[in-house]
Amino acid sequence: LVKGGAAGAGVATLATLAGCSDSDKAEIEKLQQQLASANNKISGLENSVADAEAKASEAAAVVPQKKEMVIVSTWPRDFPGLGVSAQRLAARITELSEGRLTTQYFAAGERVGAFDSFDEVASGNAQAYIAADYYWKGKHPGFAFFTTVPFGMTTVEWNAWIKFMGGQELWDEISGEYGLKALPCGATGTQMMGWFNKEIESADDLKGLKMRIPGLAGDVMAKLGASPVSLPGGQIYENLVSGAIDATEWVGPYNDYFMKFYEAAKYYYYPGFHEPGGGLSFGMNASWWGTLSNWEKAVVEAACMEEHAAQYEEAQAKNGEYLAKLINEHGVELRQLPEEIFESFGKATAEVYEETRAHSPLAKKITDHFMAALREVGGWQGIAEVAFSNHRNRILDIV
């Protein structure tokens, strides 16, 4: 029986019913009923198939498509601390998204040079960079506040500013002017002043010193007569060994150990005035960020938040161990900077902040907001954690 058969059969049957016996008529009517019933079932099946096809089409339309995410970094591949952290973050995004965001990670120099990563992402050639935003101070000095600045915030204080005191909104504003969206993705805590091939006993010893030191701290050193240089991590060692620079800051004992600076500089100075904390940046192309669903954005934010905490915690766990290695295994001389030199650092820093404020309305807005938040959160830290730590270390003879 085929659909339509009932109608055709009905016409033919009507023409012959008059000549049929009662039993034949009954049989014909029975067949007509069966044919009509079959036709109804076929129609029902067709409707069910159509409904199933429509639902399948709707389901296919809402299945998220996989997105490729090219990430460029300013750190060397497999470099302990910073480099490994960046690779871990890239892998974590893919893992948390269950493969919907597939990352391709390129370390410094593998796709573009370290300092070219900003333009690579802003142009849309890559989707994200992992870097320290103070590298982009030449584009706008306000970027420095979203890594770290002289006499600025510790990582704990900076986190509070970014998350709960309006810092992220300012970061969005300055990044947005360059087609970017940035999130915190790492931190190393308070840094050492750095590695020097001569002793530093006063501010006069900084005059003529060629030092790798980026960000606003470089401007401070310039005011004290030094010659600041901004170099990506992968180029520092060769410049220190060759004598092209006399000193360098980097991070802290854990990260510095693997750079082997001890082969070219004998003195390891602390404390650093230049990088008290802050964080690193996962800078994304803003247009690409806008194409992500809320779920995909949440995945990226969660991965960045996780790595931001992990990198900081790893540094705190390992700095003491690797400081001992530097001293005991490589004969590094740990030196404390004289108190007087901080007065010179402070005066020069105040001048740099004023120059930064004068750069533009946005630079003034960021600087003023940062300093107001610093006074508030820093004041509390002084009463609480700093005061406690000083007494604890004295009582327990920790330092």
Q: Where would I find each of the regions flagged by the language model?
A:
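Divalent-metal coordination cores built from histidine and acidic residues
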Residues: 170
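N-terminal secretory/targeting leader peptides
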Residues: 8-15, 47-50, 54, 58-158, ...
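Intrinsically disordered and other compositionally biased segments
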Residues: 7, 17, 32, 43-45
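N-terminal export signals
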Residues: 1-21
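Bacterial lipoprotein signal-peptidase II cleavage site
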Residues: 21-29
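Heptad-repeat positions
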Residues: 28, 35, 42, 49-52, ...
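Generic low-complexity segments that are intrinsically disordered, proline-rich and/or Lys/Arg-biased
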Residues: 33-35, 151
